[in-house]
């Protein structure tokens, strides 16, 4: 079964969320009514699929339907703002990204919410690797060779494609460039499919982008993967070394997802959500669904999520400032 087929199966299965409880809750206890999971990106993307996986799991466990509501725009800010301004009663949740949690505040003017103060962290859910991939005609076969080639060619003589300014691929390459002492030219595309099309055709020779869409072309030999950006080798491409093991220890630029509630949500509700979601993300059934969606499980309770946000904020603020990316 291909990744696309698995992703479609996940999407279809999650849409068919069961309405009946495995076990009930006493009247008046949380949750006592339908819960809304706001996903700030379009349907059928990875963020949406993870939101549906979490929603389906909670519905099955609690017997109250958790519906997914896609509210797109402004790199996730539209949906995140909706949750930030919702009643803090546990019935409106956010399936957020590293953008809504950390990087958007440095990339957008007039942010409609505070990335930290507007939310109560609930739980981590998953992550995905970026991949540094090249057309086979590119002279480098390893990351050290890529770095050496970029230095030999000179600043901005080597270009790479990614689907967004300030996107996870762009920031991962800026992070690597800062550590390696290179400067590469960023070519912005309107989506990963267009990057991949030009990369396969040789119109552009390099990309840093989320791994899943490129995986089949890497496995077929149509593209060459030089490194993944995750802290450890990726489960679906274990033959591809990490950036960290090729001379940059500690390098980790894996985009991640989480669940949050509006600030002021009662702590007992946050804890109940955190405990249940964390248990789910550790379960074999949910892990399989997350991996079928192209991501990997990243379990962590509300305290772990708060720590993740703090650590990532320090890292990405420094990277964005070094890259001189101005808020738009």
Q: Can you describe what each PLM-predicted range is?
A:
Residues 85-91, 106-194, 243, 256-289:
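Hinge/capping helix and adjacent helix->loop/strand transition within the periplasmic-binding protein
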Residues 21-23:
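N-terminal signal peptide c-region/cleavage motif recognized by signal peptidases
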Residues 44, 98-99, 135-140, 162-167, ...:
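Short coil/turn segments
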Residues 95-100, 104, 162, 192, ...:
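Beta->alpha turn/N-cap motifs
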Residues 101-110, 175-179, 206-240:
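A ligand-binding cleft/hinge motif common to bilobed small-molecule-binding domains
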Residues 25-116, 156-157, 182-205, 297-299, ...:
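N-terminal (or domain-start) structured segment
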Residues 1-15:
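N-terminal secretory signal peptides and thylakoid transit peptides that target proteins
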Residues 32-34, 219, 242, 267-328:
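An extracytoplasmic/periplasmic, membrane-proximal ligand-sensing/linker region
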């Amino acid at each position: 079964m291909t990744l696309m087929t698995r992703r479609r199966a996940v999407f279809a299965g999650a849409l068919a969320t069961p309405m009946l409880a495995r076990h009930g809750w006493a009247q008046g206890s949380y949750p006592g009514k339908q819960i809304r999971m706001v996903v700030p990106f379009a349907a059928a993307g990875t963020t949406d699929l993870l939101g549906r996986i979490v929603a389906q799991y909670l519905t099955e466990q609690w017997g109250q339907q958790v519906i997914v509501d896609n509210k797109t725009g402004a790199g996730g800010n539209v949906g995140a703002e909706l949750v930030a301004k919702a009643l803090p009663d546990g019935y409106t949740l956010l399936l957020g990204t590293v953008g809504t949690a950390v990087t958007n505040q440095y990339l957008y003017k007039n942010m409609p919410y505070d990335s930290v103060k507007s939310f109560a962290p609930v739980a981590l859910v998953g992550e995905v690797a970026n991949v540094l991939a090249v057309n086979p005609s590119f002279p480098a076969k390893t990351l050290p060779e890529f770095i050496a080639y970029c230095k030999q060619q000179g600043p901005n003589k080597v270009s790479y494609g990614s689907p967004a300014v300030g996107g996870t691929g762009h920031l991962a390459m800026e992070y690597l460039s800062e550590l390696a002492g290179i400067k590469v030219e960023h070519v912005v595309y309107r989506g990963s499919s267009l990057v991949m099309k030009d990369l396969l055709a040789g119109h552009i020779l390099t990309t840093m982008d989320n791994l899943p869409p490129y995986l089949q072309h890497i496995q077929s030999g149509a593209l060459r993967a030089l490194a993944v950006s995750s802290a450890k080798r990726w489960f679906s491409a274990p033959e591809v070394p990490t950036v960290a093991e090729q001379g940059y220890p500690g390098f980790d630029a894996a985009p991640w997802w989480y669940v949050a509630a509006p600030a002021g949500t009662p702590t007992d509700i946050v804890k109940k959500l955190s405990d249940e979601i964390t248990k789910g993300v550790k379960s074999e059934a949910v892990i399989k669904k997350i991996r079928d969606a192209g991501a990997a499980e990243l379990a962590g309770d509300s305290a772990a999520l708060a720590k993740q946000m703090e650590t990532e904020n320090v890292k990405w603020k420094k990277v964005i400032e070094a890259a001189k990316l101005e808020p738009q």
